[in-house]
């Protein structure tokens, strides 16, 4: 902990005293735990929050993970599963796709022939506990911190309200 304190102090001094243009990009899973000295004006020009993906973003995430697994889903099915997965983050969606592919594979070994399709994804999604349900309190606290600190939404570029 002593080393972290010294490194943090050194980092803050460096940020304050640097003489050339430097871009510092940092991430944090919990803005509440960031030290006040790091959040004060002048340390970072912009602070963004990355919210849960909206419907269009979820659709893009589905396309990526479905493509990575060499599967296909038509546009209407993509729209449908993107709509019903509100509150899912990228990891939730990846897990959903992985589970569907795994089910298709296991069923193929048993000659059941389960198809990778909208119905299968919806069935798995209905049984999936998304991060917004399993970590509701923490997510609500993070959203509160976004508002209190006037963080900008990374998708829209607007102050979180």
Predicted feature locations:
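Walker A/P-loop NTP-binding motif of AAA+ ATPase domains
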Residues: 1-82, 88, 100
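C-terminal engagement/docking regions of AAA+ P-loop ATPases
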Residues: 25, 80-95, 105-161
């Amino acid at each position: 902990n002593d080393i972290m304190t010294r490194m943090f102090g050194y980092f803050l001094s460096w940020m304050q005293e640097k003489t050339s243009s430097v871009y510092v990009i940092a991430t944090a899973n919990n803005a509440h735990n960031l030290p006040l000295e790091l959040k004060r004006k002048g340390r970072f020009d912009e602070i963004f929050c990355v919210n849960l993906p909206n419907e269009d973003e979820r659709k893009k995430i589905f396309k990526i993970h479905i493509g990575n697994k060499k599967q296909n889903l038509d546009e209407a099915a993509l729209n449908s599963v993107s709509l019903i997965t509100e509150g899912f983050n990228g990891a939730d969606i990846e897990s959903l796709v992985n589970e569907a592919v795994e089910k298709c594979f296991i069923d193929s070994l048993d000659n059941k022939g389960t198809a990778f399709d909208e119905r299968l994804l919806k069935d798995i999604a209905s049984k999936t506990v998304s991060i917004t349900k399993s970590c509701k309190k923490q997510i609500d606290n993070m959203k509160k911190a976004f508002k209190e600190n006037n963080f900008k939404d990374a998708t829209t570029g607007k102050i979180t309200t």
